[in-house]
C-alpha cells in the first residue's frame, strides 16, 4: 500500500492542538456570558412591561379617549389700524380661552371636552385636542401657550400645554389640586384656585412655582394675580384674612386679619380690596399689609351683582400710562382705573371687562360700540361700530389686523 504524499512509512502524523486557555480568561468569559444573559433578560422584561403598560392604558381608557390634530403655523398677520366700522365675518359657539384668546393668527376656543385652534381669518378649525372621557375645567392662552385643564374623577388636575400656533403638545402633567378649580392667566404663569388651595404653575413647562394650602378650617374666597403678587382672601370660621404671596416665588409676604370678607380687586398698580358692605376701597402696603381706606368705589347696592359674578381666580388687567405710571383697570358694572397710590383715576361706562393695549384701554361701551380710551384719563380716543350688534354684555375686545375679536359668551370676529 502506498503512503500518502509527504509522509514516509513509520513517521507519526502531526496533530495541531489549541493552546490552553488561561484560567483567569476562562473565568472572565464565563462571567461575561452570564452577565450578558442577565442583561438580555432584563431588557426583555422591560419591553414586556412597556407593552403591558400601553395595553393597560388603552384598556383603562387613558389613551384611547385622546384625539387631536396639529397644523402648520398660520402666516403672519399684518399690523393695521382698526377701521371706524367693522362687520361680522365669522362666529363660533366656542367659549373663549381666558387670558388672551388670540395669538399668532389663531383664536383659541373650547367646548365641553375639546380645545380648538381656529383660523383668525376664517373661523375654521386648524387644530384640535380632545378627551372624550373628561370634561374641561378651564382653557387659557398666554405667551403663545394654550393650557387645557381637564376634570378627571371630580378633580381638575389633568393639564396639557399646547403650542398655540400649531396645536402640538408641549407638556402634560397631573396636578395635586382637589375638586373643581377656576383658573386665570398672568404673565408667564397660570393661577388655579380651589376651595382650599391656590396653585401657581409655569405656563411654558407646567412646573410648580408654588402650591399654597389654606390653614385648617379656612377656605379660599378669591385670588387675584398681579405684578405685586397674588392677593388671596380667606374665611376661617368667623374670621377673615387677606394673604399676599409672591407671583412666581414661593414666598409668604404677609397675612392680615380684616374685619369683613374683603374682595381682592387690585394687585398691580397697588394692593387693594373692596369692602362689599360699604363699597369702600382699601389699600394695603406691600411690605406689611397696613390698611388705608382709599374712598368709596360705588354704593353697595350698585356693586352687589357685579361682585357676585367675579371669578374665584383672576389676573389684574394692567399696563402703563404715557407717563410711565402703573395702570390697572377693573370692571364692576363699569370700568374703574386705579392709580399706584390706591385711588381711582377715572371711571367709564362699559358692558364688559377691558383689554389694556399699550397706552390704550379697549372696551365695549354698548352692544354696538367699542371705544379706545386714553389710559391716563379714560377719555374716548376712537370708536368702532360693530355690525351686527353683540347679543349682550360681558364681551372683551382684542385687536386683529384691521378688525376686532369680541370674546364673551361666544367668539365673534369683526373686520
Residue ranges and their predicted role:
Residues 155-161, 166-168, 172, 197, ...:
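Extended, amphipathic alpha-helical coiled-coil scaffold segments used for oligomerization/tethering
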Residues 189-208, 294, 298:
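Contiguous N-terminal and early-domain "leader" segments and peripheral loops that mark the onset or edge
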Residues 203-220, 232-233:
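Short, flexible helix-coil linker/hinge segments at the edges of structured domains or between repeats
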Amino acid at each position: 500500500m502506498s503512503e500518502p504524499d509527504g509522509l514516509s512509512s513509520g513517521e507519526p502524523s502531526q496533530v495541531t492542538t489549541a493552546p490552553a486557555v488561561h484560567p483567569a480568561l476562562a473565568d472572565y468569559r464565563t462571567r461575561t456570558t452570564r452577565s450578558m444573559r442577565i442583561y438580555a433578560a432584563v431588557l426583555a422584561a422591560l419591553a414586556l412591561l412597556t407593552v403591558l403598560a400601553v395595553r393597560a392604558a388603552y384598556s383603562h381608557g387613558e389613551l384611547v379617549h385622546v384625539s387631536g390634530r396639529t397644523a402648520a403655523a398660520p402666516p403672519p398677520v399684518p399690523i393695521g389700524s382698526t377701521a371706524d366700522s367693522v362687520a361680522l365675518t365669522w362666529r363660533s359657539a366656542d367659549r373663549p380661552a381666558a387670558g388672551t384668546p388670540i395669538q399668532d393668527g389663531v383664536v383659541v376656543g373650547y367646548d365641553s371636552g375639546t380645545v380648538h385652534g381656529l383660523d383668525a381669518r376664517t373661523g375654521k378649525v386648524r387644530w384640535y385636542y380632545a378627551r372624550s372621557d373628561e370634561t374641561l375645567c378651564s382653557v387659557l392662552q398666554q405667551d403663545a401657550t394654550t393650557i387645557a385643564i381637564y376634570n378627571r374623577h371630580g378633580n381638575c388636575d389633568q393639564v396639557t400645554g399646547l403650542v398655540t400656533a400649531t396645536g402640538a403638545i408641549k407638556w402634560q402633567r397631573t396636578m395635586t389640586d382637589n375638586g373643581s378649580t377656576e383658573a386665570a392667566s398672568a404673565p408667564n404663569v397660570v393661577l388655579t384656585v380651589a376651595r382650599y388651595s391656590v396653585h401657581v404653575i409655569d405656563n411654558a413647562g407646567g412646573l410648580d412655582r408654588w402650591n399654597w394650602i389654606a390653614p385648617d378650617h379656612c377656605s379660599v374666597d378669591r385670588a387675584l394675580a398681579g405684578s405685586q403678587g397674588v392677593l388671596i382672601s380667606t374665611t376661617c370660621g368667623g374670621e377673615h384674612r387677606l394673604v399676599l404671596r409672591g407671583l412666581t416665588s414661593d414666598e409668604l409676604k404677609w397675612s392680615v386679619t380684616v374685619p369683613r370678607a374683603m374682595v381682592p380687586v387690585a394687585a398691580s398698580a397697588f394692593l387693594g380690596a373692596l369692602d362689599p358692605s360699604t363699597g369702600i376701597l382699601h389699600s394695603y402696603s406691600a411690605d406689611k399689609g397696613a390698611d388705608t381706606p382709599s374712598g368709596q368705589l360705588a354704593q353697595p347696592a350698585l356693586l352687589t351683582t357685579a361682585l357676585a359674578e367675579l371669578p374665584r381666580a383672576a389676573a389684574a388687567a394692567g399696563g402703563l400710562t404715557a407717563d410711565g405710571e402703573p395702570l390697572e383697570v377693573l370692571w364692576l358694572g363699569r370700568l374703574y382705573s386705579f392709580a399706584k397710590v390706591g385711588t381711582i383715576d377715572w371711571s367709564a361706562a362699559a358692558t364688559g371687562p377691558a383689554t389694556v393695549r399699550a397706552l390704550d384701554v379697549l372696551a365695549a361701551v354698548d352692544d354696538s360700540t367699542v371705544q379706545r380710551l386714553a389710559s391716563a384719563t379714560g377719555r374716548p380716543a376712537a370708536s368702532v361700530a360693530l355690525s351686527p350688534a353683540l347679543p349682550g354684555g360681558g364681551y372683551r375686545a382684542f385687536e386683529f389686523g384691521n378688525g376686532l375679536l369680541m370674546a364673551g359668551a361666544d367668539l365673534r370676529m369683526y373686520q
